[in-house]
């Protein structure tokens, strides 16, 4: 009887371990697949169109792999924190430090001695795959920033702060000849911020920062 109970206990623990291991493997593979798709099929082909940024990325042979690994680990670790309904403030600091650095590089290092003005809010509605991909990335880039605002700000504060930030970025790109001041960029970036803000509001109701 004792032996049977001990054996049952062992198999239960073994079953729990195998289940957790399978979850780790499946979520890890899913995070890698999603990261690979975003970086390899969307981000890199679009960003390498800019010669200056392409040269910057080419200086390090493993730029693409590094970005895929970073995004994969970020998503993978986030899943486990979400499942525990707790998120580490250290995780947030590390992820956002890298994110803000990468955002700066993408926004201010992709072009040199170039500026133009576009007042058409829908200039991305064209039959050009690269422009459509870039429009998608303009939304995607700013989702984490919107989530960052969502940690503390109220809706009115978020609207003001996010618009000022985005318009400021567009103005700096134009003034310093490193990009275009485009109404469409402002709208797409702000859409990304809005998505990130509401995602964060939802997550705040489900998780606790520790």
Regions found by a protein language model. Give the residues of each.
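N-terminal secretory/membrane targeting signals
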Residues: 1-2, 29
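N-terminal amphipathic/hydrophobic targeting modules at extreme N-termini
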Residues: 2-9
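Acidic side chains
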Residues: 8, 184-185
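Low-complexity, compositionally biased segments
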Residues: 11-12, 192
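Bulky hydrophobic segments
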Residues: 14-178, 183, 198-210
């Amino acid at each position: 009887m004792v032996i049977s109970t001990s054996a049952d206990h062992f198999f239960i623990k073994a079953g729990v371990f195998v289940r957790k291991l399978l979850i780790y493997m499946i979520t890890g593979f899913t995070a890698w697949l999603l990261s690979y798709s975003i970086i390899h099929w969307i981000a890199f082909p679009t960003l390498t169109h800019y010669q200056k940024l392409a040269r910057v990325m080419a200086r390090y042979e493993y730029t693409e792999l590094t970005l895929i690994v970073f995004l994969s680990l970020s998503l993978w670790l986030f899943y486990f924190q979400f499942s525990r309904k707790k998120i580490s403030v250290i995780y947030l600091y590390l992820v956002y430090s890298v994110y803000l650095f990468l955002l700066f590089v993408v926004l201010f290092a992709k072009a040199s001695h170039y500026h133009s003005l576009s007042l058409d809010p829908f200039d991305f509605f064209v039959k050009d795959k690269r422009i459509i991909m870039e429009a998608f990335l303009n939304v995607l880039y700013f989702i984490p920033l919107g989530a960052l605002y969502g940690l503390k700000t109220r809706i009115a504060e978020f609207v003001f702060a996010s618009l000022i930030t985005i318009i400021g970025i567009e103005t700096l790109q134009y003034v310093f000849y490193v990009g275009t001041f485009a109404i469409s960029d402002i709208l797409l970036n702000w859409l990304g911020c809005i998505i990130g803000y509401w995602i964060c509001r939802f997550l705040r109701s489900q998780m606790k920062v520790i």
